[in-house]
């Protein structure tokens, strides 16, 4: 199988928001103070980490992408420590230093991996003049692939509408992790990433997925957004866009130790992938995988490219996702031994559209597990022409792996998957389109093994060619 590419060295992201320093004191707690009914912590270790918008920048730098940080800090020790942390990670620090305010600092005291107390040192920036921040943004935004506005409600983004307009004029996507219930202030942004509590506080209670979709699409329309990503804790995340099917991703977290900074990780991975030119679905797939990693760490943490790559490549250890042929054989054998019916289909799946989603959902209903075999890039070129594929193999596989209806995704380099089908021998072989069963590649092998072969129609009015024509017409 071709390796999934996670090189982001061409991506450039600008982060503007509430910059913080996170301090951690770790110690042992074995007794109660004689002075008051509180635990006594014997401090054994201390750490300092970039927090808030600075943590977003750290996550981006961990992916080897170019990142610049804009914000407000104080002329103090915490500001100096933060500057050193940023320089050590090759982050361009364009924060404005103020004599009138301290650097926002949060001190957490922990024992046995439990947070006992948090002390906040801060003053609101709401009364600080925004023009220097706006001038720096206007001057430096050209050439960046995405702008993140990291809002913790501390006042750095008091002029958020002007910031959005500067980015829009420069044709730079604006991604915002929102704060509070006044989402109107984010009007015109490209994408918002509220968590479920924040989302429901704005749109009202959602009883099911349909409520999330309908209310989310209305919010997109009302605020003139391009997309909305609702992070749903143990239920994963849902991407919504006008004229696109909802894209639901189940959580990939195995163990949750600390959710501190998880939202920072999601938006940083999302923006980096978008700045790298990757489709929204792939960007969400990567962000979801990264969130599953970071909640397994203690405190404000980042996810690096190696960890993310391992999570993508080794998701197959759980029995699902992008797999090698050897592992697929193992998983299908185990599934058959459990009495599960294996369904297999194949295609280029160049630009995923509602017709594809509906087709794959219907294919999955024919059995218990669905395999999607995907043509490699060279195979697509031979079949579709030199201008195809639009999306790379890694992007196409990542998007398919994120669909709830798909269990396993595998690439093949030949023009047809006949050899792969003969190795896997699914119980049901499915192909989309106006085929007769005897015309479907692999039918003889499947029939000889006692399996079934079916053709399913695509949804009317949905085709990759039509999507490409619409995109070309916009240009």
Curated annotation (Swiss-Prot):
PANTHER family: BIFUNCTIONAL PROTEIN HLDE. Catalyzes the ADP transfer from ATP to D-glycero-beta-D-manno-heptose 1-phosphate, yielding ADP-D-glycero-beta-D-manno-heptose. This is Bifunctional protein HldE. The active site is at 264. Keywords: ATP-binding, Carbohydrate metabolism, Kinase, Multifunctional enzyme, Nucleotide-binding, Nucleotidyltransferase, Transferase. Signal peptide: none annotated. The gene is hldE. Residues 344-475 are annotated as: Cytidylyltransferase. Pathway: Nucleotide-sugar biosynthesis; ADP-L-glycero-beta-D-manno-heptose biosynthesis; ADP-L-glycero-beta-D-manno-heptose from D-glycero-beta-D-manno-heptose 7-phosphate: step 1/4; Nucleotide-sugar biosynthesis; ADP-L-glycero-beta-D-manno-heptose biosynthesis; ADP-L-glycero-beta-D-manno-heptose from D-glycero-beta-D-manno-heptose 7-phosphate: step 3/4; Bacterial outer membrane biogenesis; LOS core biosynthesis. It comes from Haemophilus ducreyi (strain 35000HP / ATCC 700724). Gene3D superfamilies: 3.40.1190.20, HUPs (3.40.50.620). GO terms for molecular function: ATP binding; heptose 7-phosphate kinase activity; heptose-1-phosphate adenylyltransferase activity; phosphotransferase activity, alcohol group as acceptor. HAMAP family: HldE (MF_01603). ATP binds at residues 195-198. The keyword Chloroplast does not apply. Its EC number is 2.7.1.167, 2.7.7.70. It catalyses: D-glycero-beta-D-manno-heptose 7-phosphate + ATP = D-glycero-beta-D-manno-heptose 1,7-bisphosphate + ADP + H(+); D-glycero-beta-D-manno-heptose 1-phosphate + ATP + H(+) = ADP-D-glycero-beta-D-manno-heptose + diphosphate. Homodimer. Residues 1-318 are annotated as: Ribokinase. GO terms for cellular component: cytosol. InterPro entries: Bifunc_HldE (IPR023030), Cyt_trans-like (IPR004821), PfkB_dom (IPR011611), RfaE_dom_I (IPR011913), RfaE_dom_II (IPR011914), Ribokinase-like (IPR029056), Rossmann-like_a/b/a_fold (IPR014729). It holds the Pfam family PfkB. GO terms for biological process: ADP-L-glycero-beta-D-manno-heptose biosynthetic process. In the N-terminal section; belongs to the carbohydrate kinase PfkB family. In the C-terminal section; belongs to the cytidylyltransferase family.
